Amino acid sequence: MSDRTGIFAGDDPFAIARDWLAEAERSEPNDANAIALATVDASGLPNVRMVLLKEIEPAAFVFYTNYESAKAIELEQAGKAAFVMHWKSLRRQLRVRGTITREEGPQADDYYASRSLKSRLGAWASRQSRPLSSRAALMAEVAKITAAKGPNPPRPPFWGGFRLTPVEIEFWADGAFRLHDRFVWRRNSAGESWVIQRLNP
């Protein structure tokens, strides 16, 4: 008999992740949807940075970025990534590992259109991860793009989403005296059934 009750109840890890995120959005002071996204470069050297998770789909996690950024290049070279979400207010953590594919269709268009005008223009102006001579140069590029693109800029061809389809999802909750609760969902590839295990703290 499973002892996965309360916040761990249920067999669908995406449903549990959505529930945890919804709870975190009520208690975290800001950016409850922030993830620390880990990638590796061509030499195998790891990189990590904060990114905002924008959707938990029925079978994947979606975020958006500049396709010319260091993270995007590393994502596409490796085809794999991992992230962690940590909520201090809940004393909980979610870890995810899996494969990466682009999302550059209507879903990406819709998300881009939902952003503020300044954020949409900023996506055009920023050549993410490339050297920048000064902030003044960046703001000059924003002004140039604003004049050229107007009030309804289309999604840049170099900007869009990535979908992480997991092969491992781990839920962690703080316990007294470091006796934490950890449950992991694992499978070898997307489409396979999950194997669920409790882990030692």
Swiss-Prot record:
The gene is pdxH. One of its GO terms (molecular function) is pyridoxamine phosphate oxidase activity. This is Pyridoxine/pyridoxamine 5'-phosphate oxidase. GO terms for biological process: pyridoxine biosynthetic process. Its cofactor is FMN. Homodimer. Pathway: Cofactor metabolism; pyridoxal 5'-phosphate salvage; pyridoxal 5'-phosphate from pyridoxamine 5'-phosphate: step 1/1; Cofactor metabolism; pyridoxal 5'-phosphate salvage; pyridoxal 5'-phosphate from pyridoxine 5'-phosphate: step 1/1. HAMAP family: PdxH (MF_01629). It comes from Ruegeria pomeroyi (strain ATCC 700808 / DSM 15171 / DSS-3) (Silicibacter pomeroyi). Substrate binds at K54, Y111, R115, S119, R178, L179, H180.
